């Protein structure tokens, strides 16, 4: 999204502006692990629902310690999908699925959420398997154009990778990427 904003602050302000202008019965889906998002809580005028893979919540979608994706409404918890049944790679995709479930819960049948969560295999350019050649699988993650997205992609694999990266400077910090490259990339 930074391709459409002059810097990170403008992007944050645009997101905050959406929250400020929403009114009930609008649903505001907020990521609990993101401290910037948590800081926007006071700007919310609609119904707040959270998504989190590290904490349980009384209102929103979360990943329970036993590996179940759950939805809570006023403290009533409904497990809806086992993490092991999700086809997408990476914990960031678990977070995406939790956010999607929080956004549509009560508007679409739970069975539809379960079906999508257990059958959807991804979109082009996002950790997309491209080819297997001589026992090596090649993935296209060209959508990963920021350090955060590149880190999420690297963390999606259990083995060290060969990374081919490039792009242009978006004027955001790249320092968090260095230890992840050391940890996840073959040298």
Give residue ranges: language-model regions.
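Short, intrinsically disordered, charge-balanced linker/junction segments flanking boundaries
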Residues: 55, 184-187
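Extended acidic/charged loop-beta regions that coordinate divalent cations
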Residues: 1-4, 38-84, 123-126, 130
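Cofactor-binding loop segments of dinucleotide-utilizing enzymes, especially the Rossmann-like FAD-
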Residues: 31, 53, 166-168
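Short, glycine/charged-enriched secondary-structure capping and boundary segments
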Residues: 7-10, 42-45, 63-65, 153-154, ...
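Nucleotide phosphate-binding/pyrophosphate-handling subdomain across enzymes
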Residues: 80-185
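Residue-level detector of structured alpha->beta connecting loops
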Residues: 23, 45, 158, 185-186
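Phosphate-binding loop of NTP-binding sites
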Residues: 1-32, 36-46
